[in-house]
Amino acid sequence: MAHIDVFKGWADSLRSDIEAYKSLLESSKADDHSRKLAGAALLYLVSRMDLIPDWNEGIGVIDDVMILRVCAQLTQSHDRGALPTQAEISLERMANEADKIVQFLGSSLYDKLKAHAAKLAEQAVKGRSPAQLMEDAAMRKALYSELEDELKRSVPIVVNDPTDAELRLKAYLTHKLQ
């Protein structure tokens, strides 16, 4: 199976992935690093300044699902606290799936993607930072509403030429992560 097909398949679990991150963001038992990474992952999904524009045919959503997996892997080195079982399962699955990104990008480019994802924990999107989301229920509610709108607008990812899509995906990431 082509890498792009694996990445495409990750979009199928987007709703449960978002729910897992919401659980982590709201957890009073998780450490601040984990919660900020959760906020960063969710904010990335509504950001218009992501690595690959969402309108880019076939690959526009792939960076979104990649960032979810990289952030999940980053949370493994922090205390996520006691989460609902389904959230824990989803976060561990995503963290394990990040290995597929390493296989596709190679360790050097993956390390740049990982560094980019880590920096997102300190960046505001649409006037909301991950730290603010940890403390402000109204900000979380607004973000969750935007995420729901994004999910409603999402359409199936169509890739007619997997080789071309993989080349474009790697080219975008190589260029943006210099």
Task: Describe each PLM feature range.
Residues 10, 72, 152:
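Conserved GTPase G-domain substructure that encodes guanine base recognition and part of the catalytic core
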Residues 1-44:
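N-terminal leader/targeting segments and the first structural element of proteins
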Residues 17, 64-67, 90, 94-97:
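Alpha-helical structural motif
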Residues 95-178:
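Intrinsically disordered, low-complexity, charge-dense segments enriched in Lys/Arg
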Residues 22-25, 46-49, 72, 76:
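A structural signal for well-ordered alpha-helices, especially hydrophobic packing surfaces
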Residues 41-68:
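Membrane-inserting effector segments that mediate pore formation, membrane fusion
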Residues 58-89:
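Membrane-interface alpha-helices
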